[in-house]
Amino acid sequence: THSTSSAASDVYKRQGMVSSDVFDMGGGMEMHVERRKTCNQGTVPKHFHPAAGTLVYVLDGVSQSKSSGKWKKYSNNEYWFEKSDWVHGGEADAPDLGEACSDLLVIRVAESGKDHTVFID
């Protein structure tokens, strides 16, 4: 089941959100730029992005992703790319980062007026 208004998605949307901007790119496309700061977050709820792709840049701290097929830790000035429609979040095998904090810049391009993040119940 796909949902954009579940309790988990509402918490995630607010959790750590410092800023969120949308830029009209023309041609029916928008660029979404979010800045998120979190500590001891663990994993996020299961979701995917029906977008042209997502770039996650670590401004400060440490984060992790399985976008390469295996878990990798990223720190200051490192980034990873998430392919369109890649389902992630809620992984039972996610390494525990403990009390680690992260300051992330998330950049994604999506069709204008469409949800750029879809949560899976």
Name every feature range the model reports, one short phrase each.
Residues T1-A8, Y12:
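Single conserved hydrophobic/aromatic residue that forms the stacking wall/gate
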Residues H116-D121:
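Short, charged, solvent-exposed linker or helix-capping segments at domain edges/interfaces
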